[in-house]
Amino acid sequence: MISVLMSVYVKDHPGHFQEALSSLLSQTELPNQVVLVCDGVLNDELDNVIEEYLYKFSSHHVEFIVERLKINQGLGLALKHGSHFCNQEYILRMDSDDISRRDRVEVSKRFINDNPDIDVFGTGIEEFEYHPGDLNRYRMVPKTNAGIYSYGKKRNPMNHVSVCMKKASLFSVGNYESVIYHEDYYLWVKLLVNNFKLANINECLVDVRVGNDLIGRRKGLAYLKLEFEFVNRCRDLGYFNVLDAIYYLIPRVFIRLLPDTLLNSVYKKLRD
């Protein structure tokens, strides 16, 4: 029923990567398959973790596929590559430094059985810095397709690391694309404008690590340029009209140019 799709690259922390894989093995119900894409050449520490978990997943009768890309291609293209090796009907996303709560797969299977018409669903997330629960900070998102469509005009309406999607639906809209920092957001827009059904479960099933200069990567003119490119893509699809684009961009022009300390305060306020 479920393939887990994950990407790892050389700058990922081996210990965090190990925690992510361990959280999958600790599930109350195991996934059927795990597909790991190595986005470029890795270091020995990461390769050692992969070797360890090749054995562990095999001993639990979970197929573990490792696909290695010769050069780093970015998250969107890495996931697109890996999706072709997922052999189950549903693809569950997982980041290489986050922690899936023990019942994530079990709850996902239950939701699939109860909602066969939903093409993509996600959950809430709880963010942490050093250990789960240390920030007491959550990101909850709209539950219904209509709410997701409306909320998506302002902010990303899904937590990418929490989603589970029908493989057929993903392929129907052209899969992931290389839309830097917006690979997931753009995918949701493509699905929404093509009348696929999205939903969110109103509980947290993933603990998300927010270190690694998360704030620093979300500021500056370079990031702002990517925001404009994303908006133009959404306009091309008919999701944003002129007013939508203006309302989306105005606060971001201001926010992306803030110093780190103020940007961090804004980020925390948005979560609260």
Q: Which residue ranges define each predicted feature?
A:
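Short, well-formed alpha-helical segments that are part of the catalytic scaffolds
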Residues: 11-26
